[in-house]
């Protein structure tokens, strides 16, 4: 049966308590903004900010229930997640609550996920793309029976549950790596050396004029941007590409496995290593990145990576940040070379790596499996939602 998208759910608006009222903030109620759920995972469990009951009662924000869906509606449009427990949210998002008897909460999540591209095409606004209430009125969807909805949601949820499990395991593995670094780096009073002393090379990405949209091609050498550096290791969702001939002219900005890539403008503080077994043999940086190639006769790149994810490493890196305008690190290559860290003897590092490398390998295996599961899920999604794959004979 056909419905307007607005007819299958209740649309709930968010809000922000007054920031001038400290009694409204840092309470027990999670308060969502898009940065909390833009990672592609189905559920959102943590928020950067929290509010108090007084903040909830004295603002236009609302409390979403378990199973409700949240969607970003302004600026970064179309990020979605399911709410696992009550959370409030800001005015740049909508809460979507399934209407009983028409759709289930699980099916609504996948219905919205399937229609994100349609929602984006129906945005409004001259400055920022914005999803409005009218957007949902203008989209028509075919809704199957509740029984069919439950079957479809169950199939897709199996993939998301495994993806969530892999993510939880990997978060635990990162905690182990961080602890191993802290224990090793503080075990003795190791000699301090500067990055300049342990680096084989520190170099910048190209000037912006050397890589622009007009130079992109369908395949070739992938360009690394901040979107690929959100964790400890290079993430490979999708790329823009330049030709090999073009990349050859940018040799100073080419990076390889074991190089550590940093962001110096925008999301400063990012530091990710290109792992062994990555998708491509080499990459080119965008203009907002720079990189460190370690002298492996002196230091293990894994050790340096974990240093820059420690509190001390982040403090050292961000101490060179400009305090005005767009967040950026001043003279990134020069200042990176000045940063000092404790360097154990390479013989001790090799013993440490015997413990660390299997953990990294497990992390990468989980990451690759998650990529495969995500591709399978996203391939099945349109086929299931359109009815191309018939689930009527499937028993649960």
Language model features: what each stretch is:
Residues 33-34, 47-113, 225-226, 246-313, ...:
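A short beta-sheet element
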Residues 1-15, 138-207, 343-391:
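Non-catalytic DNA-recognition/assembly elements of restriction-modification systems
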Residues 112, 116, 120, 160, ...:
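Short amphipathic alpha-helical signal-transduction/dimerization elements
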Residues 3-22, 35-66, 196-213, 227-263, ...:
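Sequence-specific dsDNA recognition surfaces
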Residues 73, 87-94, 127-153, 282-290, ...:
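A short glycine-rich beta-alpha junction/loop motif
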């Amino acid at each position: 049966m056909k419905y307007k998208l607005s007819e299958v759910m209740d649309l709930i608006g968010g809000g922000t308590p007054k920031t001038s009222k400290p009694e409204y903030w840092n309470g027990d109620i999670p308060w969502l903004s898009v940065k909390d759920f833009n990672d592609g995972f189905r559920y959102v469990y943590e928020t950067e900010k929290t509010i108090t009951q007084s903040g909830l009662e004295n603002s236009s924000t609302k409390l979403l229930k378990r199973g409700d869906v949240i969607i970003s509606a302004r600026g970064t449009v179309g990020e979605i997640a399911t709410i696992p427990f009550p959370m409030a949210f800001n005015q740049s998002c909508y809460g979507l609550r399934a209407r009983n008897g028409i759709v289930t909460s699980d099916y609504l999540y996948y219905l919205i996920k399937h229609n994100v591209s349609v929602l984006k095409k129906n945005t409004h606004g001259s400055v920022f793309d914005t999803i409005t209430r009218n957007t949902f009125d203008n989209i028509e969807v075919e809704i199957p029976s509740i029984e069919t909805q439950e079957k479809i949601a169950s199939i897709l949820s199996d993939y998301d549950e495994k993806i969530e499990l892999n993510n939880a395991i990997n978060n635990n593995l990162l905690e182990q790596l961080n602890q191993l670094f802290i224990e090793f780096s503080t075990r003795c009073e190791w000699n301090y050396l500067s990055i300049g002393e342990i680096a084989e090379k520190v170099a910048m990405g190209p000037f912006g004029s050397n890589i622009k949209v007009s130079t992109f091609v369908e395949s070739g050498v992938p360009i690394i941007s901040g979107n690929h550096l959100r964790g400890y290791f290079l993430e490979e969702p999708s790329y823009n590409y330049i030709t090999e001939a073009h990349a050859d002219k940018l040799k100073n900005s080419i990076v390889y496995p074991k190089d550590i890539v940093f962001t110096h403008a925008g999301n400063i503080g990012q530091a990710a290593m290109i792992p062994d077994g990555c998708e491509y043999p080499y990459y080119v940086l965008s203009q907002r990145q720079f990189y460190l190639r370690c002298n492996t006769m002196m230091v293990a790149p894994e050790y340096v990576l974990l240093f820059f994810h420690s509190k001390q490493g982040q403090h050292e890196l961000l101490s060179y940040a400009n305090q005005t305008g767009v967040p950026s690190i001043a003279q990134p290559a020069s200042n990176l070379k000045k940063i000092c860290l404790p360097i154990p003897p390479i013989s001790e590092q090799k013993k440490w790596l015997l413990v660390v490398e299997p953990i990294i390998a497990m992390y990468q295996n989980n990451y690759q499996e998650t990529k495969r599961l995500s591709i399978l899920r996203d391939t099945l999604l349109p086929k299931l939602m359109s009815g191309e794959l018939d689930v009527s004979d499937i028993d649960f």
